[in-house]
């Protein structure tokens, strides 16, 4: 299968509580390819990107705007390449049915983050949940929730926390190639 998603994400980094969290929400996109090996287990590789925003208490990292005496807004670009192990809970607990309207698919993820505006390279780990709605034999509509964690320095600021991360909600579509069902 191949798919594409768009949505909104928020980077959760140092000093997030110092400013308005709503100012940190930015657009995100993702394209992916994958294969279901059984009706329950599948693998997916994805590539996406977004402009992350955050806050800093000093003019450091990717500060671009002073919002208070000791508070700056920051922004930087991130590319994310990841692999996911997916488990179709609906097929696992309710049995396989090709024409099922809805499937619940949680996954675990490992990935690589590359800073566009810096030379930061970080590994990431994550979890997600795909709400898959069947449109027809070939197409699905997806509502996906995901979260990732990574090392403290991805935002260019070492703030004393061990981890930072991001959370996203996306909507997208998946096209399933021929051989769309499983024989029993």
What label would you give each PLM region?
Residues 43-44, 48, 52-63, 71, ...:
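Predominantly the C-terminal beta-signal and adjacent terminal strand-loop region
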Residues 17-21, 33, 69-73, 96, ...:
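Outer-membrane beta-barrel proteins
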Residues 9-16, 52-54, 92-94, 111-117, ...:
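Sequence/structural signature of outer-membrane beta-barrel proteins
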Residues 1-34:
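Short glycine/proline- and aromatic-enriched beta-strand/turn motifs that initiate or cap beta-hairpins
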Residues 39-123, 135:
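Gram-negative (and chloroplast) outer-membrane scaffold detector with strong preference
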Residues 4-8, 31-35, 83-89, 108-112, ...:
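Residues on the lipid-exposed face of transmembrane beta-strands in outer-membrane beta-barrel proteins
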Residues 21-29, 77-81, 102, 119-125, ...:
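Residues that define the transmembrane beta-barrel architecture of outer-membrane proteins
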């Amino acid at each position: 299968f191949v798919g594409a998603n768009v949505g909104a994400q928020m980077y959760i980094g140092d000093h997030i509580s110092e400013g308005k969290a709503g100012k940190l929400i930015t657009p995100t996109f993702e394209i992916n390819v994958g294969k279901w090996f059984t009706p329950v287990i599948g693998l997916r590789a994805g590539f996406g990107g977004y402009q992350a925003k955050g806050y800093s208490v000093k003019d450091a990292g990717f500060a671009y705007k002073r919002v208070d005496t000791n508070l700056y807004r920051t922004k930087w670009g991130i590319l994310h390449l990841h692999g996911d192990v997916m488990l179709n809970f609906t097929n696992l607990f309710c049995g396989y049915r090709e024409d099922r309207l809805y499937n619940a698919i949680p996954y675990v993820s490992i990935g690589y983050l590359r800073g566009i505006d810096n030379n930061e390279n970080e590994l990431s780990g994550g979890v997600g949940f795909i709400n898959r709605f069947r449109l027809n034999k070939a197409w699905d509509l997806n509502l996906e929730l995901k979260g990732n964690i990574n090392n403290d320095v991805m935002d260019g600021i070492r703030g004393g926390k061990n981890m930072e991360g991001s959370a996203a909600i996306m909507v997208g579509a998946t096209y399933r190639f021929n051989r769309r069902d499983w024989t029993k």
